[in-house]
UniProtKB/Swiss-Prot annotation:
Any matching Pfam family: F-box
CDD domains, A to Z: F-box_AtFBL13-like
Keywords: Ubl conjugation pathway
InterPro entries in the cross-refs: F-box-like_dom_sf, F-box_AtFBL13-like, F-box_dom, FBD, FBL60-like, LRR_dom_sf, LRR_FXL15/At3g58940/PEG3-like
Upper lineage: Eukaryota, Viridiplantae, Streptophyta, Embryophyta, Tracheophyta
Domain F-box: 3-51
Protein name: F-box protein At4g27050
Function: Component of SCF(ASK-cullin-F-box) E3 ubiquitin ligase complexes, which may mediate the ubiquitination and subsequent proteasomal degradation of target proteins.
Family matches, as PROSITE patterns: FBOX
Length: 453
């Protein structure tokens, strides 16, 4: 006879196990045996996902009236399941996590009742996602225990929020807003200010103004309305230590980033740069990030996307980045390295340079940072020769002639190099031959050691 080892586990352990699966499956275990019948109240994580319910396809030949009726039944089956489950758990202990994903349900009053029930039961983590626009009743949208909140797509805070300075979630540390439509520009900032303990903020919304005195980590993806040139962007976060910002470039920036240590920037131009036959450009470019770069000039770690390299070159007067010790860039065959000489010259204390992909657009403005165009032997001192970089990390190396030429350029110019780490592009052929070619390159630094990772 087979032994049911799981059923012999203590109740609290079984409750934890059931909390790891979707609530529909957890509820279904109650019919397995008497042992499982009363375990559902021990579940401390509720995951109501409408896609987990069974929606049978319409039968062939079903008339329009029957199709509508069956559609209505399918539409409400999810709601009945949630209502029944919450009723069974009315006397259960704390609900640590409550996740609600609605794709057909549009009964706002009923959904707000579910949310209110979760918050009243001391919920620590709340995830809300909807396909339809569903307002959350702001009058009851408050909790003294909530630590993590995620709102996505159709859900949005409705009604009238508390006055500016009012507190909604005094314990909230992590807030994520994805494609959430606030009823006014000010409302999103009222909402953020209602979370005084906030430490981590993820925003995927169109915005021009964001302020939080205490938040330490912010990720902003604001890629909407790319046809509308944004006049300005305001970011007041004096306690921020990490910024991940992805957006089209603004006309100007008004920022307070006094504590910033690390920045990951993906800034894009509204119009692509048009080069003439000589690889030069002569068009006017919208945007000015000078104030933004001035505000982050004391950072230690900087990551730049291929588009950001363009924006840094065309849209700012680059200040000296005295404290920058780690610079990471990503290349693209359609984007040039024009800013690299300026960026390296303005980073006098740079220790680590990370380059993801060596292939980039060939222009006459890359200077001596790359080996794409042979420079005349007039020689001014190379920006690489003045660079104090000790660690060079190359990712996605494919071993092409252009890549090998650039590796030769780096190894022959960077005088302070001690370690070179090369990550080979996945699927690259002739790996032994590729490694041998790099290892055979001359090195200006006698301390330079090459590692393949």
């Amino acid at each position: 006879m087979d032994t049911d080892l799981i059923s012999n586990l203590p109740d609290d352990v079984l409750g934890k196990i059931l909390s790891l699966v979707p609530t529909k499956l957890a509820a279904a275990t109650s019919v397995l045996s008497k042992r499982w019948r009363n375990l559902l109240p021990l579940v401390d994580s509720l995951d109501f996902d409408e896609t987990m319910l069974f929606y049978p396809d319409n039968k062939d030949g079903e008339d329009e009236a029957s199709s509508y009726e069956s559609g209505q039944r399918r539409r409400h089956s999810f709601s009945h399941f949630v209502d029944k489950t919450l009723a069974l758990l009315s006397n259960a202990p704390l609900t640590e996590k409550f996740s609600l994903k609605c794709y057909h349900e549009d009964d706002g009053a009923r959904i707000n009742r579910w949310i209110r029930t979760a918050l009243e039961r001391g919920c620590l983590e709340l995830n809300l996602e909807a396909a339809n626009y569903l307002p959350i009743d702001s009058q009851y949208f408050t909790s003294n225990t909530l630590v993590k909140l995620t709102i996505s797509d159709g859900f949005y805070p409705g009604g009238h929020l508390l006055p500016f300075g009012g507190v909604f979630f005094p314990a909230l540390k992590t807030l994520t807003l994805v494609s959430v439509c606030f009823t006014s520009v000010e409302m999103i900032n009222f909402f953020i200010h209602g979370c005084p303990a906030l430490e981590e903020l993820f925003l995927c919304v169109w915005m021009q103004y964001m302020s939080s005195p205490n938040v330490k980590r912010v990720t902003i993806t604001s890629d909407f309305d790319d046809d509308i040139q944004r006049p300005s962007m305001v970011l007041k976060t004096p306690s921020l230590v990490y910024l991940d910002y992805s957006s089209y470039v603004a006309g100007n920036y008004y920022v307070v980033l006094d504590s910033l240590v690390e920045a990951r920037l993906d800034l894009r131009l509204y119009e692509p740069i048009i080069y003439d036959e000589d690889g030069l450009w002569n068009a006017e470019v919208f945007g000015n990030i000078t104030n933004l770069i001035e505000a982050i000039r004391t950072i230690k770690i900087l990551h730049l996307s291929p588009s950001s390299l363009e924006v840094f070159y065309y849209c700012c007067d680059l200040p000296v980045l005295e404290d920058l010790v780690n610079l990471s860039i990503e290349s693209d065959k359609e984007k040039g390295w024009e800013v690299m000489p300026r960026l390296l010259n303005k980073s006098p204390n740079l220790q680590t340079l990370v380059v993801k992909g060596l292939v980039h657009r060939v222009t006459y403005c890359c200077g001596d940072a790359c080996a794409c165009i042979r420079m005349k032997d007039r020689e001014i001192v190379s920006c690489l020769s003045r660079c104090r970089v000790k660690v060079l990390k190359i990712l996605g190396y494919g071993g092409s002639f252009r890549e090998l030429k650039q590796m030769r350029h780096f190894l022959g110019k960077l005088k302070c190099l001690e370690t070179v780490k090369v990550g080979v592009k996945e699927g690259s052929k002739k790996s032994n031959y590729l490694v041998a070619n790099v290892m055979a390159l001359p090195r200006v630094s006698s301390k330079c050691k090459i590692q393949f990772i």
